[in-house]
Amino acid sequence: MKNSSIVLASASPRRSELLESAGIQFRVVPADINEEPFPGEEPVDHVQRLAEGKARAAAELAEGRFFLGADTIVLCDGEIMGKPKDAADAKRMLNKLSGVPHEVVTGFAIYDRERKGAVVEAIRTKVFFKKLRDEEILDYIATGCPFDKAGAYAIQGGAAHMVQKIEGSYTNVVGLPLCEVVDALRVIGALGN
């Protein structure tokens, strides 16, 4: 796909792989911002704010016109789960998700430097985990896979066997709702025709 200078404001290899799978050309310029939720902030508002913040921060660091930022959380019984702090936190998260439906919420923002505005959206996907045995959780944690993933799991990797079903976008659970992102890029003129 043709593009007009797209910059991905994320170091996530999964997000890069998803964009590459759609044939989108882009550069990676990770942007670090404070990811702590504001007191009383709703989950959708939180991921949208972070996504836009990352996109705008990348625009301060790099040349380009379109800056794509994203943030993903797992939401279970009102708790916002980001990336686990350590093995104990990963175990706590996976125990909480065990046998319980939860939501993966990804906010994405495309900041257009020329128009000085952003398209911001959030996509929700419902995920159903099977009941996990302690041994499964500990074995998965031992792989090191949970530590850079919201909710301590990667549906496309070692945690695939934990997921019974999903309702909604699979790529959203991976970290970027590709269908919606490509549509938004096309609408704002970042992909040509």
Swiss-Prot record:
GO biological process: one example: nucleotide metabolic process
Gene3D superfamilies documented for this protein: 3.90.950.10
Active site: 71
Keyword field: Cytoplasm, Hydrolase, Nucleotide metabolism
Cofactor(s) the record lists: a divalent metal cation
GO cellular component: cytoplasm
EC number(s) reported in the record: 3.6.1.9
Site (Important for substrate specificity) residue list: 14, 72, 156
The protein's enzyme class: hydrolase
Reaction equations catalysed: dTTP + H2O = dTMP + diphosphate + H(+); UTP + H2O = UMP + diphosphate + H(+)
GO molecular function annotation: dTTP diphosphatase activity; UTP diphosphatase activity
A Pfam entry, by short name: Maf
Keyword Zinc-finger applies: no
Family matches, as SUPFAM superfamilies: ITPase-like
Highest taxon listed in the record's lineage: Bacteria
InterPro entries: ITPase-like_fam, Maf-like
Function: Nucleoside triphosphate pyrophosphatase that hydrolyzes dTTP and UTP. May have a dual role in cell division arrest and in preventing the incorporation of modified nucleotides into cellular nucleic acids.
NCBIfam families: maf, PRK14368.1
PANTHER family: BIFUNCTIONAL DTTP/UTP PYROPHOSPHATASE/METHYLTRANSFERASE PROTEIN-RELATED, BIFUNCTIONAL DTTP_UTP PYROPHOSPHATASE_METHYLTRANSFERASE PROTEIN-RELATED
The protein's name: dTTP/UTP pyrophosphatase
